[in-house]
Design a protein with these regions (language model features):
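Short glycine/proline- and aromatic-enriched beta-strand/turn motifs that initiate or cap beta-hairpins
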Residues: 20-79
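Short loop/turn motifs that connect adjacent beta-strands in outer-membrane beta-barrel proteins
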Residues: 34-44, 85, 135-147, 181-184
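Residues that define the transmembrane beta-barrel architecture of outer-membrane proteins
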Residues: 43, 66-74, 121-125, 146, ...
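Residue-level detector of the transmembrane beta-barrel scaffold of outer-membrane proteins
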Residues: 46-48, 87-89, 147-151, 186-188
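Residues on the lipid-exposed face of transmembrane beta-strands in outer-membrane beta-barrel proteins
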Residues: 49-53, 76-80, 127-133, 152-156, ...
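Transmembrane beta-strands of outer-membrane beta-barrel pores
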Residues: 51-57, 92-98, 133-135, 154-160, ...
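Outer-membrane beta-barrel translocator domains and adjoining extracellular loop/strand segments
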Residues: 59-65, 100-109, 141-143, 161-171, ...
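Glycine- and aromatic-enriched membrane insertion/assembly motifs of diderm outer-membrane
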Residues: 65-128, 194
Length: 206
């Protein structure tokens, strides 16, 4: 089976304002979806830093509660909006993962209800394609308070600890909910799932 890490994070982002129209409706009340002014390569970038929780899903993790699998998460992102509807980003995400394994697990330690606890470091460096649904369906509005932004991406994931490690290609899917705090500051609630091969924690099968 595939191994999964579910992440929920709050991210604070500093943004560069778009140089498009500020309203999303014309004088007749119709939604405006373009055309948009083309900016230079250095325009419409943002940086974001945040924290949250990781929940690991492996072969034996259904043998313990979700609360026992909660671990801290850290996100750092650099992104660019190519248009108000489409953007890309490079993100580091990870920190820790916790769960249960059997004796074959690379990160097995203390016994727990017939299994072994595992806790290991994890990092995921990934590139994502973002689609701003709010701007796509409702038209660009610089002052919109809430934007819904699904994304998909791929990257390189690493687990390590106990003097061992594993590297895997990771697929990522998730959704961003951004809330406007000011002209150049957003607060984002992000939910994301990372999928890797089952050997990510050294346990195969099940």
């Amino acid at each position: 089976m595939k191994k999964k890490i579910i992440t929920v994070a709050l991210v604070l982002s500093s943004v560069c304002a778009m140089a498009q129209q500020k309203e999303n409706r014309d004088t007749d009340g119709s939604i405006l979806r373009g055309s948009y002014e083309t900016n230079s390569f250095w325009s419409n970038w943002y940086i974001g830093v945040g924290g949250g929780i990781n929940i690991y899903e492996g072969e034996f993790d259904n043998k313990t509660s979700v609360g026992n699998r909660i671990a801290p998460a850290l996100d750092v992102a650099l992104g660019k909006w190519i248009t108000p509807s489409y953007g890309v980003r490079l993100q580091y995400s990870g920190l820790k993962a916790k769960g249960l394994t059997d004796a074959s697990g690379m990160y097995a330690k203390g016994a727990h209800r017939g299994y072994y606890k595992e806790e290991f470091n994890v990092s995921n460096l990934h590139a994502d394609f973002m689609w701003n649904w709010s701007n796509g369906f409702l038209g660009f509005n610089e002052k919109r308070v809430w934007n819904v932004i699904p994304f998909v991406g791929f990257g390189w994931a690493r687990s390590w600890g106990n003097s061992t490690h594993d590297n895997e290609i990771a697929a990522n899917i998730g959704i961003l909910n951004t809330f406007r705090l000011g002209k150049r500051l957003d607060l984002t609630l992000e939910g994301r799932q990372m999928l890797v091969k089952e050997c990510f924690d050294g346990t195969v099968g099940g």
